[in-house]
Amino acid sequence: MSCIFFTGGAEVAETVYFLPKDNVDIAKNPDRDYLIVGFSQPIPEEYIEALQPDLVYLPNYVDGDTMAVEKAAYLAFTRLQWDLRNKYGINVALYDGYRTVADQQWLIESGLATYTTGQPGYSEHHTGLLLDIIVEVGEYYYSELAVLTDESVPEEVKSSTAFNTLHEILPDYGFIIRYPKGKESYTGIAYNPSEIRFVGSKEVAHAIMDNNLCLEEYISTLTP
Protein backbone atom coordinates (compact mmCIF):
# COMPACT_ATOMS: atom_id res chain seq x y z
CA MET A 1 0.00 0.00 0.00
CA SER A 2 1.48 3.33 -1.02
CA CYS A 3 -0.42 5.46 1.49
CA ILE A 4 1.43 5.87 4.74
CA PHE A 5 -1.05 7.94 6.67
CA PHE A 6 -4.76 8.37 6.28
CA THR A 7 -7.39 10.99 6.99
CA GLY A 8 -9.63 10.38 9.94
CA GLY A 9 -12.87 11.04 8.10
CA ALA A 10 -13.27 10.50 4.40
CA GLU A 11 -10.65 7.82 3.79
CA VAL A 12 -11.02 5.63 6.87
CA ALA A 13 -14.20 3.60 6.97
CA GLU A 14 -16.15 3.64 10.22
CA THR A 15 -14.70 1.16 12.68
CA VAL A 16 -17.12 -1.45 13.98
CA TYR A 17 -16.07 -2.39 17.50
CA PHE A 18 -16.91 -5.89 18.64
CA LEU A 19 -16.61 -6.99 22.25
CA PRO A 20 -16.32 -10.79 22.42
CA LYS A 21 -17.76 -12.66 25.36
CA ASP A 22 -15.18 -13.43 28.04
CA ASN A 23 -15.75 -17.17 27.67
CA VAL A 24 -14.92 -17.26 23.96
CA ASP A 25 -12.00 -19.65 23.58
CA ILE A 26 -9.07 -18.84 21.33
CA ALA A 27 -7.72 -22.26 20.42
CA LYS A 28 -3.96 -22.49 20.44
CA ASN A 29 -2.53 -23.95 17.24
CA PRO A 30 1.28 -24.28 17.50
CA ASP A 31 1.63 -25.44 13.90
CA ARG A 32 0.05 -22.18 12.83
CA ASP A 33 1.14 -19.79 15.57
CA TYR A 34 4.83 -20.59 15.24
CA LEU A 35 5.00 -20.82 11.45
CA ILE A 36 7.76 -18.64 10.03
CA VAL A 37 7.61 -17.48 6.43
CA GLY A 38 10.42 -15.42 4.95
CA PHE A 39 12.93 -14.96 2.17
CA SER A 40 14.22 -18.54 2.43
CA GLN A 41 11.09 -20.14 3.88
CA PRO A 42 8.06 -20.28 1.56
CA ILE A 43 4.52 -20.77 2.79
CA PRO A 44 3.60 -24.48 2.58
CA GLU A 45 0.83 -25.07 0.05
CA GLU A 46 -0.99 -27.35 2.47
CA TYR A 47 -1.07 -24.53 5.03
CA ILE A 48 -2.83 -22.18 2.63
CA GLU A 49 -5.44 -24.82 1.84
CA ALA A 50 -6.04 -25.61 5.52
CA LEU A 51 -6.28 -21.91 6.39
CA GLN A 52 -9.19 -21.05 4.10
CA PRO A 53 -12.06 -22.16 6.41
CA ASP A 54 -10.50 -20.15 9.24
CA LEU A 55 -10.39 -16.81 7.47
CA VAL A 56 -12.70 -13.99 8.55
CA TYR A 57 -13.63 -11.49 5.83
CA LEU A 58 -14.24 -7.87 6.75
CA PRO A 59 -14.02 -4.36 5.30
CA ASN A 60 -10.58 -2.80 5.10
CA TYR A 61 -10.80 0.21 7.45
CA VAL A 62 -8.93 2.42 4.99
CA ASP A 63 -10.92 2.05 1.78
CA GLY A 64 -13.71 -0.41 2.56
CA ASP A 65 -12.36 -3.14 0.27
CA THR A 66 -12.66 -6.68 1.54
CA MET A 67 -9.74 -8.09 3.49
CA ALA A 68 -9.24 -11.30 5.45
CA VAL A 69 -7.64 -12.29 8.76
CA GLU A 70 -7.21 -15.66 10.49
CA LYS A 71 -10.18 -15.90 12.86
CA ALA A 72 -8.32 -16.34 16.18
CA ALA A 73 -6.03 -13.42 15.30
CA TYR A 74 -9.04 -11.28 14.41
CA LEU A 75 -10.85 -12.10 17.64
CA ALA A 76 -7.74 -11.16 19.63
CA PHE A 77 -7.39 -7.95 17.63
CA THR A 78 -10.98 -6.90 18.37
CA ARG A 79 -10.25 -7.27 22.08
CA LEU A 80 -7.09 -5.20 21.73
CA GLN A 81 -8.95 -2.60 19.68
CA TRP A 82 -11.80 -2.36 22.19
CA ASP A 83 -9.53 -1.94 25.19
CA LEU A 84 -7.32 0.62 23.50
CA ARG A 85 -10.36 2.72 22.71
CA ASN A 86 -12.18 2.39 26.01
CA LYS A 87 -9.29 2.26 28.47
CA TYR A 88 -6.73 4.48 26.76
CA GLY A 89 -8.71 6.61 24.30
CA ILE A 90 -6.66 5.30 21.37
CA ASN A 91 -8.21 4.22 18.08
CA VAL A 92 -6.45 1.61 15.96
CA ALA A 93 -7.55 -0.03 12.73
CA LEU A 94 -6.48 -2.81 10.40
CA TYR A 95 -5.43 -2.02 6.88
CA ASP A 96 -3.93 -5.32 5.79
CA GLY A 97 -3.97 -8.95 6.84
CA TYR A 98 -4.08 -12.16 4.83
CA ARG A 99 -2.67 -11.96 1.32
CA THR A 100 -2.80 -14.61 -1.35
CA VAL A 101 0.31 -15.28 -3.39
CA ALA A 102 -1.46 -13.48 -6.25
CA ASP A 103 -2.09 -10.46 -4.00
CA GLN A 104 1.61 -10.32 -3.18
CA GLN A 105 2.53 -10.54 -6.87
CA TRP A 106 0.14 -7.69 -7.66
CA LEU A 107 1.67 -5.48 -4.96
CA ILE A 108 5.10 -5.89 -6.48
CA GLU A 109 4.03 -5.51 -10.11
CA SER A 110 1.91 -2.43 -9.35
CA GLY A 111 4.77 -0.65 -7.60
CA LEU A 112 2.96 -0.50 -4.25
CA ALA A 113 5.41 -2.75 -2.44
CA THR A 114 7.74 -1.27 0.17
CA TYR A 115 11.25 -2.34 1.13
CA THR A 116 9.71 -4.64 3.77
CA THR A 117 7.54 -6.53 1.26
CA GLY A 118 8.41 -10.19 0.75
CA GLN A 119 8.32 -11.99 -2.56
CA PRO A 120 5.15 -13.90 -3.55
CA GLY A 121 4.98 -17.12 -1.57
CA TYR A 122 7.53 -15.82 0.95
CA SER A 123 5.44 -13.32 2.92
CA GLU A 124 4.11 -13.97 6.41
CA HIS A 125 0.94 -12.20 5.30
CA HIS A 126 0.10 -15.55 3.67
CA THR A 127 -0.44 -16.97 7.18
CA GLY A 128 -3.34 -14.62 8.01
CA LEU A 129 -1.61 -13.92 11.33
CA LEU A 130 0.43 -10.86 10.32
CA LEU A 131 -1.59 -7.65 10.60
CA ASP A 132 -0.76 -4.15 9.42
CA ILE A 133 -2.23 -1.57 11.79
CA ILE A 134 -2.68 2.19 11.83
CA VAL A 135 -3.15 4.44 14.85
CA GLU A 136 -5.26 7.58 15.09
CA VAL A 137 -3.31 10.65 16.19
CA GLY A 138 -5.23 13.91 15.85
CA GLU A 139 -7.14 14.04 12.56
CA TYR A 140 -5.30 11.21 10.84
CA TYR A 141 -4.53 7.52 11.08
CA TYR A 142 -0.80 6.82 10.82
CA SER A 143 1.33 3.83 10.10
CA GLU A 144 4.08 3.89 12.72
CA LEU A 145 6.59 3.01 10.02
CA ALA A 146 5.61 6.24 8.27
CA VAL A 147 5.98 8.20 11.49
CA LEU A 148 9.54 6.95 11.79
CA THR A 149 10.57 7.39 8.16
CA ASP A 150 8.54 10.23 6.63
CA GLU A 151 9.91 13.71 7.34
CA SER A 152 6.56 15.29 6.46
CA VAL A 153 4.85 13.74 9.49
CA PRO A 154 4.25 16.51 12.09
CA GLU A 155 6.43 16.54 15.18
CA GLU A 156 3.42 16.29 17.49
CA VAL A 157 2.58 12.97 15.86
CA LYS A 158 6.14 11.70 16.19
CA SER A 159 6.05 12.52 19.91
CA SER A 160 2.67 10.87 20.53
CA THR A 161 2.62 8.26 23.30
CA ALA A 162 -0.08 6.25 21.52
CA PHE A 163 2.44 4.02 19.79
CA ASN A 164 4.31 3.22 23.01
CA THR A 165 1.04 2.37 24.75
CA LEU A 166 0.17 0.02 21.92
CA HIS A 167 3.56 -1.71 22.17
CA GLU A 168 3.21 -2.15 25.93
CA ILE A 169 -0.14 -3.92 25.82
CA LEU A 170 0.25 -5.96 22.62
CA PRO A 171 1.44 -9.10 24.45
CA ASP A 172 -1.64 -9.11 26.69
CA TYR A 173 -3.64 -10.04 23.58
CA GLY A 174 -1.20 -12.55 22.11
CA PHE A 175 0.52 -10.16 19.70
CA ILE A 176 4.15 -9.25 19.12
CA ILE A 177 5.92 -6.77 16.88
CA ARG A 178 6.93 -9.20 14.18
CA TYR A 179 9.97 -7.32 12.88
CA PRO A 180 11.59 -5.60 15.88
CA LYS A 181 14.55 -3.25 15.77
CA GLY A 182 17.96 -4.87 15.81
CA LYS A 183 16.69 -8.31 14.79
CA GLU A 184 17.15 -7.97 11.04
CA SER A 185 19.82 -10.67 10.99
CA TYR A 186 17.23 -13.14 12.29
CA THR A 187 14.10 -11.99 10.46
CA GLY A 188 15.61 -10.81 7.18
CA ILE A 189 13.16 -7.89 7.33
CA ALA A 190 13.88 -4.28 8.27
CA TYR A 191 12.36 -2.89 11.48
CA ASN A 192 8.64 -2.36 11.00
CA PRO A 193 6.58 -1.65 14.14
CA SER A 194 3.38 -1.38 12.07
CA GLU A 195 3.23 -5.14 11.53
CA ILE A 196 2.02 -7.18 14.47
CA ARG A 197 1.89 -10.97 14.63
CA PHE A 198 -0.53 -13.17 16.54
CA VAL A 199 1.33 -15.98 18.34
CA GLY A 200 -1.60 -17.68 20.05
CA SER A 201 -1.29 -16.73 23.71
CA LYS A 202 -0.29 -13.84 25.93
CA GLU A 203 2.23 -16.07 27.72
CA VAL A 204 4.17 -16.67 24.52
CA ALA A 205 3.81 -13.05 23.44
CA HIS A 206 5.17 -11.82 26.77
CA ALA A 207 8.04 -14.32 26.64
CA ILE A 208 9.02 -12.82 23.29
CA MET A 209 8.41 -9.11 23.91
CA ASP A 210 9.55 -8.94 27.54
CA ASN A 211 12.86 -10.58 26.67
CA ASN A 212 13.45 -8.48 23.54
CA LEU A 213 13.29 -11.51 21.27
CA CYS A 214 11.98 -11.98 17.76
CA LEU A 215 9.85 -14.97 16.81
CA GLU A 216 12.83 -16.77 15.27
CA GLU A 217 14.82 -16.49 18.49
CA TYR A 218 11.92 -17.69 20.61
CA ILE A 219 11.30 -20.73 18.43
CA SER A 220 14.99 -21.62 18.62
CA THR A 221 14.62 -21.89 22.41
CA LEU A 222 11.96 -24.57 21.93
CA THR A 223 14.25 -26.74 19.83
CA PRO A 224 16.49 -29.15 21.77
Q: Where are these predicted regions, by residue range?
A:
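Extracytoplasmic cell-surface/polysaccharide-interacting catalytic and binding patches
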Residues: S2-G97, V101-P224
